[in-house]
């Protein structure tokens, strides 16, 4: 197993300083560039790194955007324009881990704009991609050893759409 991991590490050494082993690959109808710009406008340390276009042999119109490679806060993504064959589902989501209510409110507002607010901190953005805006403290509460506190936090979360850190903490501490 170690030999295989070392082999993968060697294979990933290219001119790219930080080639990641696993990259989320997102299938869009024809909104890949628009979506990448949208996501890059929301997250810090984000940018589009490369755009490729369809050539004569590709299934898309000649010269139209095929893929957009972009980075969101250090995580590399690829977005593909490939037609309406596949749609995003809630079976896959991206978790945004936040420390404060201000951060939670910011990401919730930006990502849910023209999208759908679902439940328990989940939302779908305007492209149908699912996100969870999750306070780090909630994960700590749910992993706690006191079953009563954990159950109170879970119950409070299940009744929320956008999460409220103060209300979650109050429930966890038995002050709701």
Regions picked out by a protein language model, each given a short descriptive name:
Residues 24-27, 93-99:
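Short, well-ordered beta-strand elements within core beta-sheets of diverse protein domains
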Residues 59-60, 85-87:
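Short glycine/serine/proline-enriched coil/turn segments at secondary-structure junctions
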Residues 34, 89, 102:
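Residues that form or flank phosphate/diphosphate-binding pockets in enzymes
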Residues 1-19, 49, 71, 79-81, ...:
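Vicinal oxygen chelate
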Residues 16, 26-74:
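Core segments of cupin and vicinal oxygen chelate
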Residues 23, 65-66, 118-120:
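Short loop/turn microsegments at loop-to-beta-strand junctions
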Residues 20, 66, 90:
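Residues that flank catalytic or metal-binding motifs in active/ligand-binding sites
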């Amino acid at each position: 197993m170690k030999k295989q991991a070392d082999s993968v590490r060697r294979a990933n050494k290219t001119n790219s300083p930080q080639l990641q082993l696993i990259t989320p690959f997102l299938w869009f109808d024809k909104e890949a560039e628009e979506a990448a710009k949208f996501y890059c406008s929301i997250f810090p340390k984000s940018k589009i790194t490369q755009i490729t276009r369809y050539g004569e042999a590709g299934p898309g119109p000649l010269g139209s955007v095929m893929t957009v490679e972009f980075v969101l806060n250090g995580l590399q993504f690829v977005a593909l324009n490939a037609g309406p064959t596949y749609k995003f589902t809630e079976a896959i989501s991206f978790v945004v881990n936040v420390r404060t209510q201000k951060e939670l409110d910011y990401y919730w507002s930006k990502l849910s704009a023209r999208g759908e607010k679902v439940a328990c901190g989940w939302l779908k953005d305007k492209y149908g991609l699912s996100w969870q805006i999750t306070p780090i403290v909630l994960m700590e509460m749910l992993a706690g050893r006191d079953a009563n506190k954990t159950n109170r936090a879970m119950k409070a979360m299940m009744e929320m759409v956008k999460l409220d850190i103060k209300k979650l903490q109050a429930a966890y501490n038995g002050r709701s």
